[in-house]
């Protein structure tokens, strides 16, 4: 009888320990997930910034990487990647470096085509066209091969100018992950074609699929904030070995000396 009571007590004690450990792990995970969401929300608050000139007066997260007196540089990037079945992958996009010290903006529009060389190895053929921004208008700084490309560059709008995530907290069934070794973190949501941001992308790009995309928010670096980390937004419409269609966007605040770039 006594042994039976001891056995029962032992089992209860083990179950109690399991419940406590499980609760601690769940609480820690929920807390980290909330921190990841909050980290992304800090970036998503920038959407929309309709006039890119507004970044001259915006300050992002600063740490010891910034030198005294450096107001920092914003890097904005939007690109559309389309690889239909049986065809080469083509990427079109633009990168701007918005320098808050000089209140000047330079960058480039690029067209990249992924092909195979004579040995069947992947080869990335990229062309860059330098641009500058004045009074919120994109201006090519070198002659362009045709008027169509000129119009395409001048009319481009970055996703940060029209994207809107005011309903991000209403997105359901998000898959949140964290890798402490990098560290890196992400949040993934399945969207539908009625989503505002999806409609805006379809309005501006010829997206050759009716499939609704997944929204993937990706980040790396310290969750508390870091100028050496990055955060990216990706709308993945199709992703497989034969076909890839996705849109990526990023807005990053960095020390000005780290923003050298090349254009050709």
Curated annotation (Swiss-Prot):
The keyword Nucleotide-binding does not apply. Gene3D superfamilies: 2.50.20.40. The chain crosses the membrane at residues 7-27. Coiled coil: none annotated. It holds the Pfam family DUF576. Keywords: Cell membrane, Membrane, Transmembrane, Transmembrane helix. It is a single-pass membrane protein. InterPro entries: Csa, Csa_sf. It is found in: Cell membrane. It comes from the Bacteria. NCBIfam families: SA_tandem_lipo. Belongs to the staphylococcal tandem lipoprotein family. This is Uncharacterized protein SAR2570. It comes from Staphylococcus aureus (strain MRSA252).
């Amino acid at each position: 009888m006594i042994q039976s009571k001891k056995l029962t007590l032992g089992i209860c004690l083990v179950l109690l320990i399991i419940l406590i450990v499980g609760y601690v792990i769940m609480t820690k995970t929920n807390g980290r997930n909330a921190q990841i969401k909050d980290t992304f929300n800090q970036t998503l608050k920038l959407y929309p910034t309709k006039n890119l000139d507004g970044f001259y007066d915006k300050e992002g997260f600063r740490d010891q990487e910034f030198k005294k007196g450096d107001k920092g540089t914003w890097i904005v990037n939007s690109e559309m990647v389309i690889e239909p079945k049986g065809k080469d992958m083509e990427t079109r996009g633009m990168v701007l470096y918005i320098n808050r010290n000089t209140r000047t903006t330079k960058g480039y529009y690029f067209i990249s085509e992924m092909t195979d060389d004579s040995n069947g190895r992947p080869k990335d053929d990229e062309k860059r066209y330098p641009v500058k921004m004045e009074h919120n208008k994109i201006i090519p700084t070198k002659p362009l091969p045709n008027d169509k490309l000129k119009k395409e560059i001048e009319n481009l709008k970055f996703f940060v100018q029209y994207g809107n995530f005011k309903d991000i907290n209403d997105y359901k069934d998000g898959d949140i992950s964290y890798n402490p070794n990098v560290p890196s973190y992400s949040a993934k949501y399945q969207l539908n074609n009625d989503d505002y941001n999806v409609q805006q992308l379809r309005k501006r790009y010829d997206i050759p699929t009716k499939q609704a995309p997944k929204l993937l928010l990706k980040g790396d670096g310290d969750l508390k904030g870091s100028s050496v980390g990055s955060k990216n937004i990706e709308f993945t419409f199709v992703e497989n070995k034969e076909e890839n269609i996705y849109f990526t966007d990023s807005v990053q605040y960095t020390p000005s000396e780290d923003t050298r770039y090349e254009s050709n």
